[in-house]
Amino acid sequence: MKGGADEMDDSKARGRGDTQARARTTRPQPDTQPETQPDTQTPARARAQDVEVRELRTLGEFRDVEHLYGGIWPPVPGQGPPVGIELLRAFAHAGNYVAGAYRDGVLVGAAVAFFGAPIGETLHSHVTGALTGSGVGFALKTHQREWALARGLRRITWTYDPLVRRNAHFNLAKLGARPVEYLPNFYGDMVDTVNSGDASDRVLVVWELNDPRVRAAVRREWMPIEPPADAVSALTVRDGWPVVGDTRADVVLVAVPADIEAMRRTDPEAARSWRAAAREVLGGLLDEGATVLGFDREAGYLVSRGWVG
């Protein structure tokens, strides 16, 4: 996966806001009724595919997370990782969510979240980083959900880069989260080697913890929505570049590039064009109150103007 719940199984999750990415491993230093309690099938120390997820509390553990994040989002000289040891310590000490995922005693992923508004209802997941293609992001997200439910919370929110295809698929198709707001240049200029040179547009998603499709998703039973045959292409790909189509139809598809991160390095002009097009089309649709129903790896976002639910 790449990453930050901008991954969740953001698998090559990279980028700030809950995303995930490829990183080097770090060995730990020694030092439907609404659910209000964790599922009995998912213990507090969640395990998935030989991954153990648990809360982190020591400076040695926080140092490992800082190292992991530095590998996922390599900083430029003079800059640090998205969350450093001091903030990790402060978040954990204040009762927020700081957790690590381990495989064979090696830290392979970590997530940081804090309580948000409305108070008593919401957890905001700020950063999630994990190794690529290993199921770590899903294990972290299910653990985070159980942690939130045990504290009486109703939802988890996070942001992600809407142009990163694997993140969109993970967040929408695998977790059942719903985009609710388009946030242009949310973090301002970002100077890590993954996001540098591009506006930091993000989409805010809401994960309603007791939504039937979310409960089915964490059991791996939910089937994502298939694009209907009459869906109109509002944004398509032509020779690697974005082409804006009809955005006025009731049901539209919004495409994304195959690999925006690689495009930023090889063709920054095309990457900037994609950013502008996504802001215009997807951002415009969300601003008008349209609903993102899901995400298809090939077709992109499935968006409806008339869906209510």
Model-inferred region functions:
Residues 2-16, 20-27, 33, 37-93, ...:
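Short amphipathic alpha-helix that is part of the acyltransferase structural core
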